[in-house]
Every structure is written in C-alpha cells, then in structure tokens.
C-alpha cells in the first residue's frame, strides 16, 4: 500500500495557470488550484513518477528479496518501521535492512533481519523537483494544458 502526502502547490502554479487561462481575477483561485492539482496528478500517472517532491509511506511485506519502492524518483529514505502481527510497531535499525537508490532514482529495499516484523512501513521522499518553479518548462506547460482542458470541460 502506497500513501503519498497531498501535493503542495504554491501560488506560482496558480499564477501560471491563471496566465495560461487568461484569468485576471482571484475569484476562481481555489478552483484553478484544484484543476492544476488534478492535472499534475494525471501527468504523474501518465509519466509513472512523482513530479513534485513529497513524503511517501509505503507498506511492504518482509522478504529477503529486493523489492522496488512504488514512487519514483526516490530522493531519500527517512525510516523503516517494523509492523509485527502482535504488539507495537518499532523502528528497524539500519543494519536490519538494505537500501539501494539506483542511478534512475528507483528505490529498492530488502529486509534480511526483520525481527518480529511481518510487514514494514518505509517513509521516504520522492519527486522529480522540489517545487513548481523547478519543473522543466515542457512538463509545466503540459500540466497547464491538461488543467485548461479540465477547465473547459
């Protein structure tokens, strides 16, 4: 199970969309923000990667085999929490698991020493760029075009 924190778009994204849509007032800012958010999520689904960095928590079964993390590109891993069948969750020590973030920023994990954990929650940060202003122009324009399509229909 993969849980991503909501996309935190800034005023930059709303302003870019308003310019693209030729809106000059602030009356529709909330709906424009919702459209840009939906467009961004749509683009991320199409591209198969998170565009804007955010926190992710992913639950995986314990195994000694390498497992690929679901969100990409992975920037960093914050923690690995063991989830036992009974009892309280616990942080796994770094020597209990192995992590690899390859050159494509795909995250991989294996758990050779899980203790009593049958599953683990991996908390990590993933995304192509930190914020809207950092997106490549072609990608931000594509997101704006999707938002404009949603706005028109």
Q: Where on the chain are the PLM-derived regions?
A:
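Divalent metal-cofactor coordination and adjacent catalytic microenvironments
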Residues: 1-153
């Amino acid at each position: 199970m993969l849980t991503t924190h909501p996309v935190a778009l800034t005023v930059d994204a709303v302003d870019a969309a308003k310019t693209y849509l030729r809106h000059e007032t602030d009356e529709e800012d909330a709906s424009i923000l919702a459209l840009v958010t939906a467009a961004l999520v749509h683009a991320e689904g199409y591209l198969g990667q998170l565009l804007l960095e955010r926190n992710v928590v992913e639950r995986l079964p314990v195994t000694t085999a390498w497992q690929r993390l679901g969100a990409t590109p992975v920037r960093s891993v914050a923690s690995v929490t063991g989830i036992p069948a009974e009892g309280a969750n616990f942080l796994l020590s770094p020597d209990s698991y192995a992590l690899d973030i390859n050159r494509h920023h795909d995250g991989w994990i294996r758990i050779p020493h899980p203790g009593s954990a049958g599953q683990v929650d991996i908390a990590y940060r993933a995304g192509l760029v930190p914020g809207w202003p950092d997106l490549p122009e072609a990608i931000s324009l594509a997101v704006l075009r999707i938002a404009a399509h949603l706005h028109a229909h």
